[in-house]
Curated annotation (Swiss-Prot):
Lineage: Eukaryota, Metazoa, Ecdysozoa, Arthropoda, Myriapoda
Main location (coarse class): secreted
Species per Swiss-Prot/TrEMBL record: Scolopendra mutilans
Name of the protein in its database record: Scolopendrasin-9
Compartment(s): Secreted
Membrane listed as a keyword: no
Length: 15
């Protein structure tokens, strides 16, 4: 669960 969240956040943070 957290893994997915982190993955999405990482993408957003890269923006």
């Amino acid at each position: 669960m957290c893994k997915y969240f982190i993955k999405i956040v990482s993408k957003s943070a890269k923006k």
